[in-house]
Design a protein with these regions (language model features):
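N-terminal loops that bind phosphate or other acidic moieties
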Residues: 1-162, 169-358
């Protein structure tokens, strides 16, 4: 393992023990795709080239992981100036270490053109205007997640769970605040539109009449959070679980703590760019929720010859589609160097750039 690239945070000893326990594990990745109409608030996210494309972002990520190209749109999900989806990093990590994956549709507006588990959930509503989903639907989402968790988890395996949901940091912020956790959040942009997010959250919090966990997610969240929390709740009883992501996974963790999970088997895995985000106070947020390991990976994108990849280290995108957790698993399983991983990422970037221009 490259000690300079994979780092332990929070409870350092616990994080190192968790990493050591993974050395001989088999990894499986679960990508949970979803949608919240909160993402359609102008200026709140960079995920997707424009409002009309937002609904395609998550299914396109799922298709890209499976096929190497997207079917619901003509290119891969990119920002207006061509910064690539973090699913590029995820795909390279999975392919290079031969890590299998599956997709869960947890309320995506568009169903992906690839095999997947379908929750039959509706997408989340704009939380500044109404509750995301009914309490009954949140309970159904949790139970669906638990079924997935029981079905796919095996001892001596590590399950990595990632998400793809535009605007998800805003619903995550609302959920954290709803649970009384004092925090800020990360963003897909270097200048975090925190005023827009805070106003959105403030509008949503006015409706909150109960701190019952199901009610908090119903009023303030999105469909991804209860599904992933359900998966974590059951999977962590059986095997190690890495919540692969940033702010959204802290919201999952906060909800999971209230419905039950095994923290001894749980860690958060993310890119170092989440921890570099001064606005997010990520480690402090995790510490407020529970004492679990945080593991980060630096994919050395600041050294890339491509501006689109370097942008990750400059504050754009930072994380998503389970990229950080998958790169951690890939490096542990394949024993490749970080330089080799960067070389493979650049090779894939060149390939998809050619797809985009055709």
């Amino acid at each position: 393992m490259d000690e300079l690239v994979i780092s332990s945070h929070g409870n350092i000893e616990s994080a190192k023990e968790f990493i050591n326990s993974l050395e001989k594990s088999q990894f499986t990745f679960c990508l949970v795709i979803s949608y919240t109409e909160t993402s359609e608030i102008p200026g709140i996210t960079i995920a997707g080239a424009d409002k009309e494309f937002l609904k395609f972002t998550s299914p396109a990520d799922a298709e890209f992981l499976r096929h190497g190209h997207c079917k619901c749109i003509d290119s891969i999900p990119m920002s207006p100036d061509g910064k690539p989806t973090p699913a590029l990093l995820t795909k390279v990590a999975l392919d290079s270490a031969k890590i299998p994956h599956f997709v869960v549709n947890a309320g995506s507006k568009i169903s992906p053109d690839t095999s997947h588990f379908d929750s039959q959930l509706e997408f989340g509503k704009n939380i500044s205007e109404s509750k995301a989903l009914s309490p009954e639907k949140i309970s159904e989402a949790v139970e669906f997640g638990k079924i997935i968790g029981r079905s796919i988890s095996q001892p001596n395996q590590c399950l990595i769970i990632g998400e793809s949901i535009p605007g998800g940091t805003t619903t995550a912020l609302a959920v954290l605040k709803g649970f009384g956790i004092n925090t800020s959040v990360s963003s897909s942009m270097p200048k975090n539109p925190i005023e827009i997010k805070n106003q959105t959250v403030s509008n949503a919090l006015k409706r909150l009449k109960s701190d019952d966990p199901i009610n908090v997610i119903s009023e303030l969240g999105d469909p991804m959070i209860p599904v992933v929390a359900g998966i974590l709740s059951e999977s962590s009883k059986i095997t190690r679980v890495i919540l692969a992501g940033g702010t959204q996974m802290t919201a999952v963790l906060a909800f999971a703590k209230r419905i039950g999970y095994n923290k001894q088997n749980t860690a958060i895995g993310c890119t170092s760019y989440i921890l570099d985000d001064g606005d997010a106070k990520f480690l402090e947020t995790v510490k407020q929720i529970d004492d679990i390991p945080v593991i980060s990976v630096n994919p050395l994108l600041s050294e890339s010859k491509f501006a689109g990849l370097r942008s990750y280290s400059e504050g754009f995108v930072k994380e998503g589609a389970g990229a950080g957790g998958c790169m951690i698993a890939s490096l542990l399983k394949s024993r490749m160097t970080s330089e080799k991983l960067l070389e493979l990422i650049e090779k894939e970037y060149q390939r998809i750039s050619a797809l985009k221009s055709n």
